[in-house]
Every structure is written in structure tokens, then in C-alpha cells.
Amino acid sequence: MQNRALLAAFAAVVLTTASSPAYSLAGGAAREISFAAEHDSGTIIVKTGERKLYLVTGGGRALVYDIAVGKPSEQWFGKSWVSKKREHPTWTPTPSMRARNPRLPQSIGPGPKNPLGERAINLGWGAYRIHGTNTPNSIGSAASSGCFRMRNADVKELFERVHVGAQVLVLR
């Protein structure tokens, strides 16, 4: 009898979670939400003050992800686009990063020490990217040099959903 009660309780939790609008998709932490914005499906909207990235899915809906944003002195706002998508990217410090810390390595190849994590989605101008991270505890903070960090599971999901040319809007 106890086994049936335990099984019924477990099934209720699973069914409640699966039918919830905040259900986590594909192993990441994305939540599907109502999103009252007039943007095409596939548009990425970053709200730096919220530390959130929204992927518009259409029909008044969007997926929302928690992110890390640039330090206050490194933040930028405006329009861009997805210019390239890279799996297992190599990280190369920018000249400004190297000026701040000359001891940085020339580059870090794919692997657990790579600051870009498992995926990088390059944006159309500058050295800015939406990428994974090797410091997941930074998610929710203003910690980067202007890029947008995501948990690796989340950036892998986003990587599969966005296409080169997709519009990116970065808002306060």
C-alpha cells in the first residue's frame, strides 16, 4: 500500500511539472512564458537589468533563460544579429582583455577551462558573443567583458534553435 501511495505522489509531481508553463525544456533551464512583444519568431532579446535572455517563439510566447551580462563598464545596448555559430570554440582574449591582464594565455582550446563553454553564438559586430561558461556560478550577475554567458545546457539548446542572421536586441 505504501508503494502505491508513493508512486501516486511521484506521478502527481511529474504530471504537475510537465503541464506547468514554466516546464524546463530539453535539459536546460528555459521556461516558456507569455511575451507581449512585437518581434519575429527567432528574435533574441536580452534584458541586461533582468539578467535574462528571451527567444521569441511566436504566438505571444518566448523562452526565457538566466544569463550573466557585462560588468557595468562593459555593457552595451542596441541591435545586432547572429553572425556565426561555433561548437566547442577556442577562446582568444581581446586586446582590451590582454591590456587589463597581460598574463592571459594566447588562447584556450575546447575543454573545461575554456571561458566560452561548449557553444559560442557570435554577434554581428565587435567581439561580442552569447556563449556557455566554465563558471556557471556567475549566471545572474554582471561579470563578463560584454558578452552574455549562459549555462552550457542552455546555450546548447539556444544554439539549436537560432539561425545565422537572427536579430538580437540588447536592452537595459
Can you describe what each PLM-predicted range is?
Residues 1-8:
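Bacterial N-terminal signal peptides that target proteins for export
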Residues 39, 59, 71-74, 78-79, ...:
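Exported/periplasmic cell-wall-interacting domains
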